[in-house]
């Protein structure tokens, strides 16, 4: 899964190379510019072609971050996001069986317009928005079985986070035993799940 955030890049003036980090060097050492759709597509075409040659079954899911970059203003942000959306659309045309898109950007901007879906800075999604996006994502890509496994894993995670008032009590010891049984049942159905740390912690708490 790859998330595009911005189509703006920094280039070293001396070399013309795009940098991933300015390393606290003076801003005057760099040019900041908007990449074109063709530039991004060309880079990712060679990358995806190489990856799928090694793994023909590879599926790549793209998203565009709904967080707005307003340094250059709202219009420049829209130009950047539009460039990214057009890039992904082109990549889907080039790799229709390998490249897919999840519309996180559109969901936040078109469906979640209320203030409660944004943090105090009015740029970042609120926890409520994140949960909504996660539900949309899981409904789109997860099978019913996967959702059930996630529910059971989350149930165990919440149990493990429980902080007892009386850790030596018989009731808490039974509670720990129930967690171990839940883990054993889940591993019995899905042996690839790793609950070693949780199991060890339960046994430590059972035998202080």
Question: Could you say what each language-model-derived stretch is?
Answer:
Residues 2-16:
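Short, solvent-exposed beta-strand-terminating loops
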Residues 6-8, 66-68, 105-107:
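Active-site-proximal loop/turn and secondary-structure-junction residues that shape catalytic pockets
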Residues 10, 41-60, 93-98:
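Secondary-structure boundary elements
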Residues 12-37:
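A solvent-exposed, charged loop/short amphipathic helix patch at secondary-structure junctions
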Residues 23-32, 80-93, 124-126:
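Acidic, His- and aromatic-enriched active-site or binding-groove loops in soluble protein domains
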Residues 49-78, 111, 153-163:
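Active-site segments of SGNH/GDSL-like serine hydrolases
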Residues 59-61, 82-114, 136, 150-152:
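Extracellular serine-dependent O-acyl
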